[in-house]
A protein has these predicted regions:
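Bacterial Sec-dependent N-terminal signal peptides
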Residues: 1-26
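Signature for phosphate-centric chemistry
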Residues: 24-148, 152-323, 328-342
Length: 342
């Protein structure tokens, strides 16, 4: 009898373990609130100082950066949310939480009008901070010499560049600066605009079927129901999911424009992680190398070659600049990191 009980206990334990293993969802993540902002996240505040041995002397810097924190890149998500919330209000389905979101969304619209996509005060401070730390960490390069800086034509990238070099100039006005901005820099800073293979890749939409499959299975709609109400006429389930993503985009982007908002007021941790995963997968499939195609990463080839050439020239003493600065976008960094296997 005792042996039978022991055997039964072992079988039950094994069954529990096996059910746990098979029930585990590999896409179930537990990132914190800040991490779930993805590329909408501002630069981290806590920065570890860079140190190098006394035996080494910095000889050249090649810098590729994203623009600083900004207002929402367009009004699309805010306006989609406004339309849905206003309709829910008129139909009487809106919840008290929905009214809170309506006020918050209207505040974002008011703050962003005529500034959509522009660098904000936080973004300017981020660039000044990076510039200050760079000069302090690699002071031998900043006693004199030339700083060469380029940016994409985007106003937020351009302003990031000027905030950066302006701070360097304030710290040492003996430095010389050469700056360049505009579409002339698109092959390096916005290759996704000009690379024919990539444009064709996006047009063909090979990334879309796997994304749509994931999106339909993992995008939660419970959060949007809590603001619009269960009886709100969402239309089809796809439209409901798109509204859920619009809510995510608006809330996840608020810290970049210094608007105070606790996402956990509107999402559970699991919902926020799931919505982020949809946002993240879309970027992964569109902006990096995957089993679908290497084209999204290959577009960074010209930038990699430019980094190599300017570094080689610095080593050979033929690069007039002691520092090369480049200011682009998250969509500039993702292909670059992918191509370099970072």
């Amino acid at each position: 009898v005792h042996k039978m009980k022991r055997f039964s206990s072992i079988v039950v334990s094994m069954a529990v373990v096996m059910s746990t293993v098979f029930a585990a969802d590999p896409t179930d993540t537990h990132y914190n609130i800040s991490e779930c902002q993805g590329s909408l996240r501002p630069y981290p505040v806590n920065v570890v100082p860079v140190q190098y041995p006394d035996s080494l002397i910095p000889v050249h810097i090649n810098h590729v950066g994203r623009h600083g924190a900004r207002y929402p890149s367009s009004a699309a998500n805010c306006l989609a949310l406004r339309t849905a919330l206003s309709r829910a209000d008129s139909l009487g389905t809106i919840t008290s939480l929905g009214r809170d979101l309506m006020k918050l969304n209207e505040h974002v619209i008011a703050q962003s009008t005529d500034r959509w996509g522009a660098l904000d005060s936080l973004g300017m401070a981020e660039q000044r901070g990076i510039a200050s730390r760079m000069l302090a960490n690699y002071l031998p390069l900043f006693t004199d010499g030339t700083i060469d800086a380029i940016s994409s034509y985007s106003p937020r990238a351009m302003m990031s560049m000027y905030c950066f070099v302006h701070q360097l100039d304030r710290l040492n006005n003996k430095l010389e600066f050469i700056t360049s901005t505009g579409r002339v820099n698109s092959p390096l800073m916005r290759p996704f605009d000009v690379d024919k293979d990539y444009i064709e890749f996006r047009k063909e939409g090979t990334w879309k079927p796997p994304y749509d499959e994931y999106f339909s299975g993992h995008c939660p709609t419970s959060a949007i129901e809590r603001v619009l109400g269960g009886s709100f006429p969402y239309g089809d389930v796809q439209a409901k999911r798109e509204l859920a993503m619009a809510e995510y985009y608006v809330i996840a982007g608020m810290s970049a424009m210094s608007v105070s908002c606790d996402p956990l007021k509107f999402f559970t941790e699991a919902e926020y992680n799931a919505l982020w995963s949809c946002f993240n997968l879309r970027q992964y499939l569109q902006r990096t190398a995957s089993t679908l195609s290497t084209v999204p990463a290959d577009i960074a080839g010209a930038l990699v070659l430019d980094i190599i050439n300017t570094t080689d020239a610095a080593v050979q003493g033929t690069n007039p600049a002691v520092v090369n600065l480049r200011f682009g976008h998250a969509e500039t960094i993702m292909p670059l990191a992918s191509l370099l296997h970072l």
